[in-house]
Amino acid sequence: MTLAAYKEKMKELPLVSLFCSCFLSDPLNKSSYKYEADTVDLNWCVISDMEVIELNKCTSGQSFEVILKPPSFDGVPEFNASLPRRRDPSLEEIQKKLEAAEERRKYQEAELLKHLAEKREHEREVIQKAIEENNNFIKMAKEKLAQKMESNKENREAHLAAMLERLQEKDKHAEEVRKNKELKEEASR
């Protein structure tokens, strides 16, 4: 089997990498593995959790079947046998635990109330700041509007004054033309 084929099969079977333990059972008695021309010798490693069966060997490659063995629980000690038996708690211990639980509950309540008070205070500050900003905006808008109205009033008055001046000049000019015309008519008689 080539190394590339073996690696490819191992990629296809990710669980095999979890269950396979390729360690030497007795490193002193077993000869060391020799790497030869991109091949893997499956007899070199001891695989305790799986079995590899060669199915077909031909020039184009090799096929094999990997059979995972079920886990065995031989030699595993029972948990109950190793654990010491729990003794019943005394009335004083129960009372102490209840008092400690009550203190924890009160502390948690106090922390929650403190947190809520801080949150409310922060909300009040945010609302107060928003009101102040709104009032400042209204004040600035009123000032701008008053300035604009004053400017418009001044421009209008200046425009009216200029129009009146032009009308007065036209009236003067018309009066002069009339006088000149009357003088010419009297002179021509």
UniProtKB/Swiss-Prot annotation:
The keyword Phosphoprotein applies. The keyword Glycosyltransferase does not apply. Residues 48-189 form the SLD domain. Gene3D superfamilies: 6.10.280.30. Its main location: Golgi. Exhibits microtubule-destabilizing activity. The gene is Stmn4. PANTHER family: STATHMIN, STATHMIN-4. This is Stathmin-4. It comes from the Eukaryota. The modification Phosphoserine is found at S90. Residues 168-189 are annotated as: Disordered. Nervous tissue. One of its GO terms (cellular component) is neuron projection.
